[in-house]
Amino acid sequence: MIRQQFAIPRIGWRVYVFYAVDALDTGVIERQLRAIGCNDTERVCRGIGEPNSGVTYTNTASRASVVVIGLTTSADEFANTYDHEKGHLVRHISQHLGLEPYGEQEQYIAGYVSQQMFSVAKSFLCEHCRQNNNALANFIRVFL
């Protein structure tokens, strides 16, 4: 599992992203969810460990979100899950801020989120790199 944290300073939002997650990582995800105020971690974490899956949880009161992207079977499946969960994140933020769903402000947030996540996500968008990252994540999980 690879962790990433970033802020969206203009709106005071914190984002915690977990990549290459499998079922063994559920405890870490649950702790982060509780830290941002999630009271139903069992329900939120139900699908963690399934290939090509993810989940995004947002607590608007604390202006914080947790994004989970599971292990994927291919680079294009990663791209699909990444876009899907990133879309949920942006929609959660936009709804809370009352932004027009077809307006520029939502797209500026989406662009900023993409830029922040790209530094990690890029290594999963290439099939060779994705396989190496999955192997590295498993090594870290087992030996560190």
PLM features: what roles do these ranges have?
Residues Q5-F6, T26, E50-S53, T73, ...:
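Beta-strand-rich cores of mature extracytoplasmic or soluble domains
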Residues N80-H92:
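Active-site recognition of the HExxH zinc-binding catalytic motif
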Residues N133-N134:
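Long terminal regulatory regions of eukaryotic proteins
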